Amino acid sequence: GAGSGCHTLALQEMGKEVTAIDISPLSVEAMNKRGVKDARLQNFFDKSLTGPFDTILLLMNGSGIIGKQENLPAFFHRLKEVLARDGQLLLDSSDLSYLFEDEDGNLDIAPEDDYFGEIDFRMQYKSIKGDSFDWLYIDFNTLNLYARQAGFKAEKIEEGEHYDYLARITHL
């Protein structure tokens, strides 16, 4: 989600109309206190979120909200519902396949294993533990495959030094 609203505030300062969503009530409260004009307690998959939006930002490993590889078709279906026909999704993620490379550079992943980018997170601060949740880091080739199957074009527009990338997704 939009978290504390830092990207939203920067876009507002540039005169953009921005809708910021997050599933955390505390994040929405923080955004409101910081001056975000349209901060909503909402999930991307919630049907009450309606578009069309000309740009959707999923930054800071934003692919995580998809949760699991098996959710990619539902994600792209939802994207079709809310993204304007000439709109774009900007998404960044990290390719975790390097964690499974053997000494020869081959991937050491059994076919029956879950997708290597599926992570089960649980946040903890001192003695306070949150519930666990699914988070998806997706390599660009897999993202591109699912995007094309759903009628979208994925372009890698920036590549970082730590197996991370920024992608732009548009309707075909």
Residue ranges of model-derived segments:
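Conserved SAM-binding loop
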Residues: 31-32
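Conserved SAM/SAH-binding beta-strand->alpha-helix loop
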Residues: 24-25
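A short acidic, Gly/Pro-enriched loop at the edge of an enzyme's catalytic core
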Residues: 45-56
